[in-house]
Structures are given as C-alpha cells and as structure tokens.
Amino acid sequence: MHREHLASRLGFILLSAGCAIGIGNVWKFPWMTGQYGGGAFVVIYLIFLLILGVPVLTMEFAMGRAAQKSPLKMYQALKPGSRWGWHGYICLLGNVVLMMFYTTVAGWMLQYFVDTAAGRFAGLDVSAVEVAFGSMLANPGRQTVYMGLIVVSGFLIISAGVQKGLERVTKWMMLALIVLMLVLAVHSLFLPGGSEGLKFYLLPDIRRMEDVGIGNVIAGAMNQSFFTLSLGIGAMAIFGSYIGKERSLAGESVRVCALDTLVALCSGLIIFPACFSYGVDVKSGPALIFMTLPNVFNNLPMGRFWGSLFFLFMTFAAYSTVLAVFENIISCVGELTLWSRKKTCLICGIAIFLLSVPCILGYNLWSSFRPIAGRDVLDSEDFLVSNLLLPGGSLLFVIFCTTRYGWGWEKFLAEANEGKGLKIARWLRPYMTFVLPVIVGIILVLGLYNFFAS
C-alpha cells in the first residue's frame, strides 16, 4: 500500500492523543487521584509522565518516523537482517488482542449512550441500575450488535484513507470530546456541594497518602503514567511514520501527554463534584461508569440530557482509541500481504469481529471459561496486553533505541531531535540507557506479581 502522510501537525497530535485517551482516563485516573492523596498524587504522576512516559513515547515516534513503516516492518528498516523483527509481529498481536476486548467495552459505551438518551434509566433506583448493567452483560445478542457497529463503522472510516478517513474523523471527534468534557466539568462544578468533591479530588492530602502507603502511591503514579499512553505495541509508532521531519519529537510527545492529562484531570472534575453532591461513593472501573454515574444522573435536574452527553463523551474516548489501533492493524497486515487498503480493512474487520465475540460470551454463555489465573475472558485478554505486552514491548523499544545491540543512541537522538522544537539533551544518555529500562522492568515485574498474587 502507498504510505500516506497526515495533512497537518494538529491531526498528528490529536490522533496520537486520541490513541492515548481512553476509558482508563475516566474510570481509573480520577479514582486513583482521590484515593492516593489528591493533588500530591497528581504531582508525582506528572513527574513520572515526564521521566518515563515522554521518553518512551518519543522513542516510538522516532522509530516510526525513521522507518516510514508499520511496527511490523520498522525493525527490518532500522536494523536489517537482525532478529529484532520478531517483535514487530508481537506488536501486531498486541494490537489485535487489545481490540478483542476494547471493541466490546466501546460497544458498552455506545449502548449506554443510546439507553440514556432514550430514557431507559429514568426513575430506576440504585439496585435497578445495577440490575440493568448485569442484564446488559447477560445479553450476548445486543452486545454483539453494538460491538459490530463499532467494528464495521471503524473499518469503514479507516478504509477511506489516512487523511480522508482517519485524520478527518478523529480531528472532529477529538475536538467534540474536548468541548463535551469542558461543558460537563463546568456543569458539575456548579452543583450544590460540588466544591467538597473538588477539594477531596485536588487538594493535597498527605494523610491519605500515608494510609495507602507512600510506596503504593509512587507505584500507582508510575504505573498510571506508563499505561495511559498505550506504549509498547507500536500504537504510537504508526503515527510517527505518517509525519515529516519539520518538528522534533520530544516536544510533540509533551503535547500529546499534556492533552491526555488534561482529559484525565477534567474527568475527575466531572465525577467528584457530581458524586459528592449526591453523597455517592466514587468507585473505579466499570462500577463507576455503569452503576454509580447513572444513579447520579437520575438525581440531577435534566439528568437524561447530562447523562447522554457524558456517555457520548465516553463513546468518543473509546472510539478514538479503536480507530487508532485499527489503523495500526491494517497498516501491519497491508505491508505483510500487499493487499489493497479496502481489501485489508474488509478481512481485518471480519477477523476482529469474530475474535471479539469470546469477550462478550465470557459474561454469559462462557461464564465458566476462565483462561488465565481464574479470570474471565476480558480480564485475561487485558492481562496479556496491560501486564505483559505493553511493558515488555516498551522495554524492548528502550533497549533498541539506546544500545549498540539495536538501532543505537546516536541514530535515535539524531531522529528525535531533527526539526524545530524541544530537543533531547545528550547528557540524558546514561539515564535513558541504564535507569529508564530498570523503571520499565520494575513495572513489568510488579504487574505480573500483582496479577497472580491477587
């Protein structure tokens, strides 16, 4: 396939941020901030984002831009004849496994947007809202329809091309997401009693940090700063391959991280004041999105309207990631098979749809199927991506970019610093060569330990 380039720098930043911005920004980061010390946790998180997230993100961008290939072929372009190429296939596998459950969760968001807009939660009490979520999981047919809508529409957009499909749709969707987020946050801040939620969320609280344990707070901030950017499976490298060399890459990485953090912080501005206003405990994960918040919206004046806007915001957050990863998949498969873009989208679309069905069935017909450590299908697939492929892949990216066994520090530095903007200082080499891989390795080991120990 002919390699297109993105039409604008804004498109590149919004696409990359769209890939990073996902459901975790809403259902994990605000809860962690509230529980782990408020503003104090945010400061620690931002430090790790700068010393961990930005360098690894810059490496992914640099590898993609230098190779002008998908993750599947970029190692062969940068280090011909080496064994590094096998990791390109693992990157493709990681993107596929991610979509095997993420398309289902994106379908849940779309389904809740439709149900909220239709007034199906209006008048339900707390237990009835919880039953509604359980009923959704127990219905494989309806889940499959919404997952199918996500997959089919996603590959239709991707089939139109990088500029006319992916970039055009994602730019408008990301701008709409930001507007929705700001409107929801401003509304939430003016709710009665909302200021108490804001204080709990953002004011530094050392006592809360001590209760959780300073070590746990640091580990939580380190993990969140890493996982929020979806690093390690080439999901960001693909966008590096679609840009020119006018701008240096460290500055672009900072901008992407800033936009991702803005969405995460604003999500808390939506959630905490609303929950405190109605005396509802803030939880994390699906319980927050599908049980806690529908109850809050039921109590709000014009709750159906505000609930619909929130789930539209969530749908956009999930869908932006889906589109970015779909692009990565079809780019890899297209370079491997030399099929046309439309043929690649058709075959990949069918494959992703079929591979996504087990996640849906894991909540009903296959509920007894627990493939990894007694976890259901979604949690098992999430483990493979989040605990294994993301940190493991990032560790390989760091080693490849900083040592003589791979691409090497000098070539990486030259590529990352080419163009106008923020440069990576040469004196950072010892940190990025020796300290950074240790931090990523700790994240990998901690993730595996926590999964099997829990």
Give the predicted meaning of each segment:
Residues G11-F48, G234-G240, G251-V254, A258-L259, ...:
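Transmembrane helix-boundary motif of multi-pass solute transporters/channels
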